[in-house]
Amino acid sequence: MDIRARTKIIDIYSNLKYKKPLKSFQKILTTSDSDNCEDFFNIGLNIDKNKITAIGFDGDGCIISTIATELSIKAIENKTINQAKKILSDLIATYKDKNSANQVVEELKLLIEMNVTEKRLQCLLLTPSNLLQWFKNF
């Protein structure tokens, strides 16, 4: 990862815009992972007419999972559920197969640049995977 990407990651982590109290949200999703990951986030959502009108998170995680949560939330805010599913599916598919033809939205390209190891992949995909599963069951 180049210095530009590292600087951007530190800047985002130091200025999380979507980390906030979740009292005003209609729905709360708690992330979970079957491995020994201790990272967890609560994702607050307001959905109106199948569109994500407001979204935020609280909780704690490593820098990778926190950045992935912040950027995933930014990417799906003001999108329909179907648009959010596509955005998250494309991210997951691209990360698992770098030769994938899927297009990753601009907000999530930094996650691809992070080039994490297999062990840290669960950190990066914690929130996107949980959100995608929740939207599939919506």
Swiss-Prot record:
- MF term (GO), any: iron-sulfur cluster binding
Q: Which GO terms describe its biological process?
A: iron-sulfur cluster assembly
One Pfam family name is NifU_N
Q: Which InterPro entries match?
A: NIF_FeS_clus_asmbl_NifU_N
- Supply the name of the protein: Uncharacterized protein MG337
